[in-house]
Each structure stands twice: as C-alpha cells, then as structure tokens.
Amino acid sequence: MIDVSVLICTRDRGASLSRTLDSVTRAVGVAGDMAVEMVVVDNGSTDDTAARLAVWQEEQAFPVMLLAEPRAGLARARNLGLAHVRGRIVAMTDDDCVLKPDYLLALVRRFAGVATPTIVGGRILPGDAADLPVTLKLEDHPMEPVPGAFPGGFVMGANLAFTRDVIARTGRFDTRFGAGARFVAAEDTDFLFRAIAAGVVVAYDPYFVVEHHHGRCRPDEVIALLAGYGYGDGALYAKHILTDRRILGAIRRDLGDALREIRAGTRPFPYIRRFHSFRLRHMLRGFFAYAGHGLTARVRLSNAHEKA
C-alpha cells in the first residue's frame, strides 16, 4: 500500500522542476521505509521538461508515474493526476517549490490516526531573498478556519495535502478556475469551499514545509498576480452566491475592509495605494465575467434544445 502520493503539475519550467524533483528525492531518502509514489503531470510543456522527467524517473528507486495533459489548465492537470494517485495521503506542491528534507516525515506524522476525510495545508516559506513576499504562508502555529468564513488564503495549493477519500466527498477541481483557465485563479479556494461545505476537516499545520521560488521580483508582477486572484475570487463568488450564504458574509467583509481603508487612509500593501478597493474592482470583473459566461452557456443550451 502506498502511504503518500506526491502530485506535481508542470508547464515549461524545466530548470525549476529539476530543483523540485531533487528535493523530492531527498525527502524520500529521509523518509526511510515509507511507501511513496510520485505522480507528475506535464501540462503541455514545449521546453525540455519531458526529457528532464524521463532522466529523473530512471534514477529513482521509488515509483514514478509520468502523465501528459495537453489541454492548458492547472485544474485539468491536477484532475488527471488525482485520477491516478494510489496513496492514502495526496501531497500537492508546485514546480517552483522545494520540499524540506523532513517534509514526508512531518506530513505522515500530521495524518497519523486521521480516519475521516481531511485537508491540511502546510507552511510556505520564501525560497529566494530576491523574490517579493507573496504566495507565502508564514504562520508558525497550527490553525483551524473560522467557522463560516471564506477560506481564501487559509491554506494554499502550493503545499496542500489531503486523504484520498476527500475527492469522493468533494469532487475534483473545477477546470474553469486556476492558472491557464478562463478565471485564472481560485481553483484551490473553490476546492476548499466545497470541501468545508461537505463536512471535510480543514486545518493548517506549519511542520511540513516547502520553499517557494516563485521568481516575482518586480511590483508589476505582483500587482498582476493579485489582480488575477481578485478576478478568480469574484468568479468564485458568482458561482456560489445563490447556494451558499458564506458568500454574502465574504462580500460584507470585503466591502467593510474597503471602507475602513478609505476612512483610515492606510496602505496595507506597499505596491497598491488602496489594496481592498483594488481587490474589489477585480472581483467585480470576475463576478460579472462568470455570470456572463453562465448566461451565454444557458442560451446556447436553450438554442440547442430548440433545434433538436
């Protein structure tokens, strides 16, 4: 029986991926007799990723499965990987992350005795001092989400682990969300949102750790990233607003944050004068884009039925 399946999806990051894979090899070596498999999904790379993966696979003493998903989209790639994992625990990280050597040992300790569908996010530290401080999770103590709160940012897909039975309870990732998809982000938040609604236990644990070498060194790169996050969250709000009251609570919180920011004249984010207003603007874009997409789809379906 496989104890842990490590799932990584990659696209055109050959050099970065090699660093990630080497960290997996080290972590497996430290893990002793733990049964670990590696599942890598190449999401349409056009660089030397395939060649690097083939060489690395031959060098490993543990099972490595290489899959290809040519259709763009991180959620699509993850879904393909999830259809093939065999481990009791699935550990997802990104192709620009590096696992700490004791990652697998700490992960298995956290899930020891867990008997119900459970998701646990791990710590994400900066990998390069030149990178700006985004897409990190720095808290050094275990946490649980606030009941009824919107889970965005509580844990992140760059270091996310769960028992394999979570998939049957929650469903797979929504392929309309995430990198490479129509709504560019929030695929992990949507997954968490549905999981919590389905009764899955969600928690944060700081003891299984990755370093994130995201490479964003300029403010304009960070601003574009945060605009995408807002856009994705807005689309997620539109997806769930009619069926889940947590969305209304999240909207009230976002509006309150923006008003307090305007009144106080504070600048919570160094590169954006009014961050919460900036976020609201891009959330509105995402909200109406999702609503318009849904309306278009319904019209097409109606027209198809009329012609049938």
Where are these regions (language model features)?
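Acidic donor-binding loop at a coil-to-helix junction in glycosyltransferase catalytic cores
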Residues: V155, A179-F193
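N-proximal low-complexity "stem/linker" segments adjacent to membrane-targeting elements
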Residues: M1-R26, D33-M34
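Short aromatic/hydrophobic "clamp" motif used to bind/position activated sugar donors
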Residues: V90
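Non-catalytic, C-terminal membrane-associated alpha-helical segments of glycosyltransferases
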Residues: A224-Y231, A238, L242-A308
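Short, flexible, basic/aromatic active-site loop/helix in glycosyltransferases
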Residues: G122-R123, L136-V155
